[in-house]
């Protein structure tokens, strides 16, 4: 898919998602390129966005929302969110997803869990028959992360520490590291996520099933 066509789809998805918003809602705001477009589209409706209370899933999304004059609040202000709007890296036919390409998987999962309604914006390039072409992000605490990586390595085809082009290790907003892991053929992603949760040091993975 050409980038222009993909961006057009993202814009259409963003406009459709805005229709689910009502004045005064507490909105969980995702992270990523699709959400950047969503923020841009939402900024055109000042009477709506000015009434929203926004809980962001990353410092980057929080800044972009504030730059567009939106009201970003701390997550501890509300025990429950009205709606969460986010993107996805892969979505299968059962609506299971791989997320975390933008590095915000932990905060995205926390926010999604607290939302009464969840909307995920995924253009056709993200829709797959089976999860796994996109590497599964696994968030691991910084302390001894090499040990945890060695423990998860047998579960995957390969694991790779996420780094910048300069070679610097990328840290999440929680100061953790991320390993991008290629899933083995025919692996059950839900079972894999369960196995990962048993390994000390693993915080969460980018697998999003049913809450």
Name these PLM-found stretches:
Residues 2-86:
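N-terminal active-site beta-alpha-beta segment that forms phosphate/nucleotide-binding
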